[in-house]
Swiss-Prot record:
The lineage of its organism: Bacteria, Pseudomonadati, Pseudomonadota, Gammaproteobacteria, Pasteurellales. This is Peptidase E. InterPro entries: Class_I_gatase-like, Peptidase_S51, Peptidase_S51_dipeptidase-E. It catalyses: Dipeptidase E catalyzes the hydrolysis of dipeptides Asp-|-Xaa. It does not act on peptides with N-terminal Glu, Asn or Gln, nor does it cleave isoaspartyl peptides. It is found in: Cytoplasm. The gene is pepE.
Amino acid sequence: MKNMLLMSGSKYKDTAYLVHTLPWLAQFLADYKGKKVAFVPYAGVRRSFDEYETTVQNALQSLELEIVSVHRGKQHRDIIEQADVIAIGGGNTFCLLKQMYEHDLLDAIRAKVNSGTPYFGWSAGANVAGSSIMTTNDMPITYPPSFNALNLFPHQINPHFISGKMQGHNGESREERLEEFLIVNPQSLVYAMPEGTALHIQGEQATVLGAQDILCFSEKMQLDTKAVNSTFNY
């Protein structure tokens, strides 16, 4: 059974890196102390893989996990195949997916997660768990072989969702951008995840975690609000 924790971002309000996720992760990984976590660092454009690995190791030290970046393997997918848990960090979703294709990780991750290996990711790491990355917020744009992602959660995800416009901002709001996506892709569902929220996926059910509701948009911006602590079939 799939077991995934998809988190909107690495920070919430003024909290330090990944601090707000620790209670969720402690419960999610309660049975995995001392186990090996394969970490995928490809989204980290402004830091090296070594730096990203160390940052995550330090942030999650209290969970007592063995966190190993996939770049430590002779073949990156070797680390995935040896792991007890898979984690994908945030950053640039285009760079992340491009390198996941280059290192042949998608099928390996998909097979492991469908067989029950826990998966957690934040921001870009949540985005690639969805059907495609076409509702990412990111620049720079690099070109992966396809925008199709892991499809472990078979819908679109939009992390860091903010409703409305800032004063003086004359570009599109997030709702307007998602409306345009749904005009072009009317069969899609988009799960808009505000800061400080997460989806805990267990099999074919999802539970909303955090301090805010998650918004599900469909054709013509029909809204289905997923309330905090609610569980739904997807």
